[in-house]
Amino acid sequence: MEESESQAPVPPHGISLVSSPVRAVIRIRRKIRTMKKSRLQVDLTGERSLDSAKASLRRQISMDRASLFKSSTYEKQQYFNFDTPTLEKLALTSQIRKRNRNKSRHVLYPGNVRKCLPVEQKSKAKRCLLLFVGIVCFQIFNAIENLDDNLQKYDLDGLEKTLQREVFGQTRAIEKLMDHLKDYLATHYHNKPLVLSFNGPSGVGKSHTGRLLAKHFRSVVDNDFVLQYYTNHNCPNESDVIQCQAEVSAMISQMISRAEIEEKIPVFLFDEVEAMPVALLDVLHSYFQLNQSNEYLNVVYILISNIGGHEITKFVLQNVSNDFFNLPQELHQIVLSSLRKHHSLWDVAEIVPFTLLEKRHILDCFLDELLREGFYPDHSNIESLAGQLRYYIKGNKEFSISGCKQVVAKVNLLQPYT
């Protein structure tokens, strides 16, 4: 039987009727049978024992199977293996993939149309985003242009130069005032009216600053939108307070209505507020509230008074050795506490304190007044006039008790001798 199996016809190599794995199994079986015969013959001669022959036979069979499996090759690479591909194989594989990818990119055109590549669809969301960014940039640019137009309309740069030239010794007060005006007048739409309060001792330039402001705004907006109200002149008697209330309320309402039509911001200056009756202060306070129509929010109110002047004088004299100009917050709180005792309307006001004037500022006041009246500016004469005033003396500094209030009267006494 074994001979018949060994003599079985083998198909020619040209035609493979059995798959490669089956042929490998057949060869293994033939090899095993051949080895069994040879091993048995050796054992029969007595050279080896039966157990050692079996062990050797199993070892040989396993080695033959391993070597035969390694040496067997397949006609096609159809099965997965753990062999690490070489660089040449990787390069070849990538070239094949590129070639296949290029083949798949060919576009088939119908015979009756013009050959052209399909148009890529652009994202509509991207277009909308670009449009939105463009609109925002345009609005920002337009807002900046409007701010510049408003500031130019009120000529605040010219106002600042005028104040710095004609108001002596109040550099910090002018800077704070201009900051508030520039911030508020940059636009026509606001959520509250601007309430400024000029406070300080007598003769330091509060009323003079108010007159310069009124003159400037009359020239840039119109005389109809600027109101100057002096308490001792317009409402001298407390018995007339009811009539004063009606007059003030009517003037404010009418002026605001006209200004809203022409898109202008009116300016109201109330001087000598320390003499104003409480009932009249209540009327003003009602216009400072936030819960009003829009036209009543686009207004500038300026309150000028001596309230807090004593506290400012005391603060300046106590801080002569220090740079009291570097303590604005402390001075602001001192003045505000004094104003709150007088009336609650100052809770919504921006405090602009005017401090004491030094002797060098008094000399400037005399020089300016002499030139204004046509006198020759003799330095010795100016020193003589300034020496007639009273001063607080602290260290090496002299602060005028009455400020520049008596300068005009002193210069007027010189006129009979010209």
Swiss-Prot record:
The keyword Lipid metabolism appears for this protein: no
Q: Which InterPro entries match?
A: ClpA/B, P-loop_NTPase, TOR1A_C, Torsin
According to the UniProt entry, its GO molecular function terms are:
ATP binding; ATP hydrolysis activity
This protein's source sits in the domain of life called: Eukaryota
Predominantly, its location class is: membrane
Where is this chain's protein located in or outside the cell?
Membrane
Print the keywords alphabetically: ATP-binding, Membrane, Nucleotide-binding, Transmembrane, Transmembrane helix
| Protein name (record) | Torsin-4A-B
Per the UniProt record, the lineage of the source organism begins with: Eukaryota, Metazoa, Chordata, Craniata, Vertebrata
